[in-house]
Structure formats: C-alpha cells, structure tokens
Amino acid sequence: MPFPFKPVLAAAAIAQAFPAFAADPAPQSARTLNEITVTGTHKTQKLGEEKIRRKTLDKLLVNDEHDLVRYDPGISVVEGGRAGSNGFTIRGVDKDRVAINVDGLAQAESRSSEAFQELFGAYGNFNANRNTSEPENFSEVTITKGADSLKSGSGALGGAVNYQTKSASDYVSEGKPYHLGIKGGSVGKNSQKFSSITAAGRLFGLDALLVYTRRFGKETKNRSTEGDVPIKNKGYVFDPNKPFSSYQDYEAAGVARSRPDPQEWVNKSTLFKLGYNFNDRNRIGWIFEDSRTDRFTNELSNLWVGTTYSPATGDYRHRQDVSYRRRTGVEYKNELEHGPWDSLKLRYDKQRIDMDTWTWDIPKDYDTKGINSEVYHSFRHIRQNTAQWTADFEKQLDFSKAVWAAQYGLGGGKGDNANLSDSYDVKLYDPKIPTTSDTRITMLIENRSKYKFAYWNNAFQLGGNDRFRLNAGIRYDKNSSSAKDDPKYPQAIRMQIPHLGSERAHAGFSYGTGFDWRFTKHLHLLAKYSTGFRAPTSDETWLLFPHPDFYLKANPELKAEKAKNWELGLAGSGKAGNFKLSGFKTKYRDFIELTYMGGSSNDKNNPRYAPLSNGTALVGTPVWQNQNRTAAWVKGIEFNGTWNLDSIGLPKGLHTGLNVSYIKGRATQNNGKETPINALSPWTAVYSLGYDAPSKRWGINAYATRTAAKKPSDTVHSNDDLNNPWPYAKHSKAYTLFDLSAYLNIGKQVTLRAAAYNITNKQYYTWESLRSIREFGTVNRVDNKTHAGIQRFTSPGRSYNFTIEAKF
C-alpha cells in the first residue's frame, strides 16, 4: 500500500526544507483581558489545534460547515439528509462524540443514536438534528483534534469545534468610535443569496454590537448524469387482496430519483451585544442571539412500497423542518493588579433549541376522490433548554527564569428535554375541517439533566531563551440525568423504565499535558497527552419503544464513553513559512451501540421481558437495547505547512501549501475480533498555490484536493453484520478537485471575493454522503438491489460563489 503515503513523503521533504529558509519571527503579543498568553519570542504551535480567525473565514468564503472544513482533511461534516448536517467527524468518531460549543455553551444533542435513527430518522423525522450556527456571527473558530474534555467537557471524545462570537472590541476602540459593515453575496451550489450587516459603536463607557444575517436558497445541487428510474420490489409487489395468486406485476409507488428533492429554505439570524466599562478593570455585558431556519421540501424521493400487509401506495409527501435557537446571557469581567487572579469572568447563559418536523401527505388519487380527499398531517417537536453558569480565573506569575500561567474555574448547569407528537387528518380542499381526532402524545421519555465541573490548567515556561514549555491540567465533571415521571405512563411501561424519577450520574476526571521544546532557533519538538469522555445522551439512556415488531428497552445503566490520546510532532516557523508534522494514536472504550438481545420473553425476570403498554407480554419479538460494547483505536499522520516562495527568490507574495491527513483504525468487539470503522475518512491531501500582491489590493489562490477511495474492505455492513462491507462503499472512487478563489480590494472600504469550485465539473461521491444512505425506512434511500438512484448522492458539480463587502 505505498500510494496513500505519497503525500506524507512529500510532507517530510518539505519539512526538511523549511529550516534552511527560516528567520526570526516577530515577538508574541502580551496578555489581554480574559486571555493569558505566556510572553515569549517564538510562535507557539499546538498539536491537534487549529484556529480560524475572521480574516480567514472571509478569505475562504465560509457560508456553512462544509465551507469551514473544505481544506482541512482531518475533519468532515456528517451528512443528515434534507435538513442539513449532524455535526462533524474527527479521528474516527462523529456526531455527539465531537463537541460543538458556542462561547463555551454546548449545542444540541444530535438525537442521532442508532435507536433514535432506526425509529424516527429512517422515516424522515429529525434525520438532521444538530443545530448549526451562523458563520457571520463568529470572530474565531477553534478546531481541536483528539480527545479534549479538559477544555470542552463531555462530548469531546474525538475532538471539538469551538465557536467564539464577535464582540464590539473587534471593531471599535478609542480611536475608532463606530463601525459599519455591509456584506452580500451568492452561493452557487444551492442557489443561495445572503446579506449581512455588522454595526458596532462606542460612546463613553458603553459599547454595542449588532450582526443581522438573512439567507435563502434551494436544495443543494448534485452532479447527476442519469434519469429517474422506476422502482419495483424484485419486479413485483405483493397484493394482500389476492393472497393465493403469488405476486402481481404492478409497479410500486415512488422512484429512485437521480436529483435532489426540490427544497426552499430561509434563515434569519441576529446577534446583539451590549457592554459597559465601569473603568479599565471592570466590565459588564449582555448578549442576545436568535436564529431560525425553515426548510420546505417536496419529498419526491420518499419511498412508499407495498408490503405483505398493504398494497403499494404513493402519496406526495411534503415536509417543513424548523431549527430554532435562542440564547440570552450576561457576563462580568474584572482585572486585578495584585490578587488571586489577573482576570476574572463570570457568566450566565440561557439557551433554547427547538427542532421541529411537520409532515403532510397529499394523496395521488385526489383527482378521482375530489372533495373527499384527505391529507394526513404529523408534527414532531423536540425542545432542549439549557441554563449554565461559569466562573473563570487566570493568573500569571513571573520568576527569574520561569513563568507560570494558570487558568482555573468552575461551573454548572441544568437542562430539560421535552417533546411532542401530534397527528391528524383534514380535508384536502378545506384544511379547517378535521376528519379524525387530534392525537397528541409524548413520543419520547422526557428527562432533566444537571452537570457541574471544575478545572485547573497550567502553562509553564522554563529555562532561558524561551526554550521549554510545559502544560498540565486536570478537570472534574459530574453529569446526571433523570427521566421525568408522568402519571399517564401505564404501569407496564413504568416497569420498563428503571430508576424512573431518580438520577443516574456519571463522574470522572479528565487530564491533559503537553511539552514544547525549541531545540533549535526555529524548530520545536511537541508532545501531548489528553483524555476525553462522553456521558450518554438522553435518548441513549431513556429511549423506550414498546412495539410488537421492534422492542427497544431503556438502559439507565450505561457507562460514559472514554478516550485517551497521544500525539508527537515537529514544528517550525520563520519568514519562509511554517509547518507542523505530527503522529497520533487514540484509544476509545465503552462505545455505546444498539445491541440485539434476542427474542422477547414473558418471564418478568428475563432481561428480554417485553410488555406492551396494556400489559401484554410479547414472546419472540426482537428486543434491542443501547449497551456499552466495543473499544477502538485509531492512529495516523497529519501535516500542514505554508511556504513563502519569495524566500528562494520568487516574487514576493507567492506562497504554496500542503495539508495532509492519513488515518487508520479498528474497532475491537466483545469477542476480541477487530473490525473496520465506517466513520474513518479516506486519506486526503490539499495542495495550494497563491499570490497576494504586496500592495494588499488583490490576490488569487488555487487549490487541488486529492481524496482516496474508501475501500469496501475498510467498512462493515452494520454492528450486527460485521463480516460484510457497507454495500454502497463500492461507489467510492478516488477523485481530484480543483478550486480557484480571488479577492480585490477597492480602496480601503470595499472588497470583492469570488470562487469557482470543482472547476472540471467532476462527478464524485464523498464517503460521508455514501454512508448516509439507508437500507430501510422511507428517506435517504436507493434501490437496495440495483442501487438505482445512487446518483442523487453525488456532490455538487462546478459552482461559483461571490461576495461583496463594504466597511466604514
């Protein structure tokens, strides 16, 4: 297998070249409010951590999560179907195993456990359910790869994506009392148009910031070359009205579409901050954030086929998905010249996240039934409320040949998860006339949660000439949850919810340590060890589904998932550029997976005892439960570097770069057998060549992205079929993409940016898209046997982005 390592060999060659062209870097900035930086003379590079600042976000024309990680091969976006994404994939884990925080506040649980997706996601309910955030609101994004619960708490098993929102101080100061920024543009891949305004002002001790953004667009386009293919179930569909005449040769409703379902969507986002400085050392601030996305989808790819219980049907299904987030918060900052802290920040936030799905089915035979036609409506709602407080302290002590910078603090919070399911039928031509009663139920066990934490993180600069740096930290977390008791629960159901009304807690310590040795003027040896954990989500713990065809048992006895991460690297920086080469290994254990327990029993002492809500005990029904099962390991190599080519006599402003990630791993089953991990992305290398004019007026960048195929032998079919590959992996092929972007500054106020993606109009499948296909349910489907409709999952062809921004 020599080919996958070619980018790594190139990376090693570039690493050897950098020291020869290095020169003295500029001194680091000193400490600022709420940020302690150990003062030194060399540029600090951290293993497994990348910061993307506002300037880079603008340069890369970032409009969503896919744009954010487009040129970072070590992270990808988990596809979620029509309604968006399900978080990120980092180092072989995804979804809730990668933490997402905004200003330190955790975002919604993804509701993406296997059991939840089996029951709801497969039929189009919350198939994309991790809320996204507006890119125009952020001043900086920090991506951490590898276990990172020391900084990010529960969920940072494989890494974390931490967003930091803009502040008035990013734009105004004593010398500049106001700022106005206006930005607009278009995104070709989904016919998106957007506009955003950023306004900031400062008067006396008061400052304010407002960011308002509106986006609207359509479905994300693909690169399809085939037409829609009618689907048949083996060419026939069983007709229950004629049980003795074998199969009837009529066609099942629905088609294997080669194009995305028609969709229209709109997003509105508001960020408002208000602050007052009592003096140079005391400040109070208030924040308000509000964001809503509505998606209207004509679900033409929804597959309703005949079964042994019913003939083929084919209603037109329409959906509206709503994602809503509202946050308010207050914070207080203090600085002391002498005392137990140099800086203190107290913060309290309240957050509400709603994820809704509204479905309505219009019958295909409405033209023959006329006024008697009926429409089925279904509304599913999930709400997650969070309240969090934190107290963060920072202190730096300077000694003759050492500096000690400490960060310490504590915090806590509580959460509440509620849900609702409502369904009814109405007249097609007069929706005000119901034809059935309103069925309103709680579809999931509701729960409450609490958490608290305390941490102590230290950075030591040792020896003269800033040669040694040591980081060491510890954090304690305790997370607990309890299922809400409901008097409507039948006694049979109560018996199937152990510890109903009582708390189930997970507590433990997280650690992190790192070492930075500058062994030459421009080279550093880096080392890092860190741990991570993920407490079970609410649906993993409490989800109960008593049904004669599929019986799911709750499991409050789940243990937290855990990870250990080791990393070693070499870094260099200077006028010629910078680079970082690292190798890592991460071990995971106690993965939570949906487990088949066997057929149900009517023995109350049997763990497979499965009563229905009426008390009837099922016999022989498949029983499933979320359980801690597997362990896993991943290891790999990453390289990223930038080379300023004027260091070898080429024109000033010319630069090139390389970003490579290669990772492999295996899951270890309970029987000791090692199996592939589907969440591992194939190796990817991103090459870049760019020019920024010395006048800063214009620049151009070209990118070439090479991604290997995901081999079927590196996949598994499912947790219950570990001996066969994922059937759609055979469509994964290696591909190379070429992109081009440019900018032009017109005076000091106006900037034009444009980009062309997939210039060669390549047809390709990402691995994330292929592994999102379902073999059951009604959405994200293709024909299981012929794979007709697979081209619906191709990525966009050639597309163009454009933005214009004015700042005053």
Task: Describe each region flagged by the PLM.
Residues E140, D148, A160, T165-G201, ...:
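Short strand-turn segments of transmembrane beta-barrel domains in outer membranes
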Residues D24-Y171, L568:
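Acidic, small-polar-rich N-terminal luminal/periplasmic segments of exported/outer-membrane proteins
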Residues S152-G153, A168-Y178, G205, R281, ...:
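Short loop/turn motifs that connect adjacent beta-strands in outer-membrane beta-barrel proteins
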Residues G188-G217, N222, E226-N298, Y324-R327, ...:
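Transmembrane beta-barrel wall of Gram-negative outer-membrane proteins
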